[in-house]
């Protein structure tokens, strides 16, 4: 028999991480989906084989249950050109390109979520895609590529790995709808770092301001994600509304009216650095509906103010990666410094009126297989 007392989505935590599969979500209002700002994230030890995609350390944003910054491309087939170059491929997702190169296809191109905190006033997760990039080496996918004519070449996005480290820290600032994303990137040599964003419903708006790039994405449900992007290196911005490889309806797929499906273009933004061995990106992602204006994001040096929240981070190529987030009103703090406390993350949160202190270090997934 079903329980007499029903449960609602409002009872679920605002953040949840499943590190064995490499999935994390952050929400502001699960009890009222129409007003919910959501961020989803993937960095999976299972890699990008079968139906999985080469989207390690990629995120998506949503408002009202509808996508804003979202993975692009169409599933036109399993290994056709559009699928391999513009759907499975890292260039189709909200992640990073290294020298314009993408992540491996196969289980070898994996990521993982080494640490996280599911809190009440703050939430946090870290993805590590340091092992995701390089040439495709999977015998299975090499054979599939041979049968389908896939070219695993630098021109198509696969080359020798030039990456040492790619860690992406994501911090949810309570129920504000603001998500802070801090990327620490280290190369084996000087490379270009390409920061990617995509929308699938409406085009993005790009503003190049004095010390930031502001990218605004929208969905058709009135949702907005404003990405305030800061970088340690000089960047060049671009946006296109065409795919690297155009989709074709070669299977003659039809809609409910029996007409052939036409696959629409999506919008693709990139912010690419000059060649450098070390790079850091900071994104203040403000996701909300038409119920409030955009949050004011004010930068003074390495300090950024967003409402009652203060963000301090290393946005230079020198020294160790570091980020500190605090809200003195709520008495909430998060601190990460790769050069201190053996690189641990410390969190102070307020849960049910009581202070909670956590020290987070890397935790390996506990697989059941």
Regions found by a protein language model. Give the residues of each.
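Short, Gly/Pro- and small/polar-rich lid/capping loops
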Residues: 1-52
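Short, solvent-exposed loop/turn segments at the edges of secondary structure
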Residues: 19-21, 54-56, 63, 89-93, ...
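Well-ordered alpha-helical segments within folded domains of soluble proteins
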Residues: 21-26, 58, 280-284
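Structural recognition of the beta-strand scaffold that forms the well-ordered cores
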Residues: 25, 40, 59-62, 67-71, ...
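Short helix/loop capping segments that flank catalytic or ligand/cofactor-binding pockets
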Residues: 34-37, 49-51, 69-71, 78-79, ...
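A structural connector/turn signal
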Residues: 56-57, 168
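Long, histidine/aromatic-enriched segments associated with O2/redox biology
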Residues: 71-72, 130
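CBM-like, beta-strand-rich accessory domains located in the C-terminal region of large
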Residues: 78-369
